[in-house]
Amino acid sequence: MSLFICFCCQEPGASDEYNIINYGIGGQIEVHVDYWSPENKRSGGARVAPFLGYLTSLQHGGMTVFPGLGLAVSPEAGSALFWLTVNTAEDYDSRMYHMGCPVGRGNKWVLSKWIYSDSQMWSFPCARREGNYPSFTNQS
């Protein structure tokens, strides 16, 4: 089985600018989900896919943890996480709650970007038509 995902990120409003974030010793982020409900979404639509790139490696702490998936990822320079926060109906996936554990030693530097739904029309042309909600991924 192969997995292919393609998102449009170049047109205005398709995604946020890249953010570089630093967490020093003890730095962390509490459990949250990268999602805005349709009632509160910004222009550009719902956040559908966060990208988190690790710019530094850590020996102690700083893991990104998804409690609902039983998944913990240690920061390793040059690696990245990418996940979907919603289905094509823009309903959030509760398994995508995550947190950044406290940094034990050193500095955790990450690069983040959020991709929004409204600019994905050509990636998923039937996603919002008459309740037709296919998967965001094409599997073969």
Describe each region flagged by the PLM.
Residues M1-F82, V86-S140:
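Fe(II)/2-oxoglutarate oxygenase catalytic core
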